[in-house]
Amino acid sequence: MAKVSVLNVAVLENPSPFHSPFRFEISFECNEALADDLEWKIIYVGSAESEEFDQILDSVLVGPVPAGRHMFVFQADAPNPSLIPETDAVGVTVVLITCTYHGQEFIRVGYYVNNEYLSPELRENPPLKPDFSQLQRNILASNPRVTRFHINWDNNMDRLEAIENQDSSLGCGLPLSCTPIKGLGLPSCIPGLLPENSMDCI
């Protein structure tokens, strides 16, 4: 049985300009105290064609975590436009939130992200080189895709066994009929890389 359950992920300040930070309010519950940190990551999928373009926007350590319910706001800077292929700058991609314990990923929450020009003129005649300053980012918050992984909470030597299922506790319908791509359980998408900082539980 998993020692940590994600109760809710709320997408904050959405939609936003492309260069605005990502902000998620994450609520989770620990069935028993965890001696070590949980590591949360926000990953931006730069291209559906290759994981080479994934960007780890931030990584944060939360813990040690006492038993009970906890909430924190996870903020990460927008992706680096220079690392996104020009052909993938406009349109639909994915942002992922992952959590690991002892180096083992046990949950992944993915959202579709639609980047589009607000100006009708730019929509009809987009510039050859994407103008990120004119793009709006809209996260489809009502349709998360949740993938869970069985891990050994007491021994990180065990290998992971991935299972995908519906998380009714997140309070939204999960489109499980969609076709998984590259093992993510995410339609038309993928996952990334970067620094760590420490955050205590609230």
From Swiss-Prot:
Post-translational modification: Phosphorylated by TLK1 and TLK2.
GO cellular component: chromatin; cytosol; nucleoplasm; nucleus; protein-containing complex
Domain of life: Eukaryota
Keyword set includes Signal: no
Gene3D superfamilies: Histone chaperone ASF1-like (2.60.40.1490)
Cellular compartments annotated: Nucleus; Cytoplasm, Cytosol
Tagged with keyword Nucleus: yes
Protein family (similarity comment): Belongs to the ASF1 family.
Listed name of the protein: Histone chaperone ASF1B
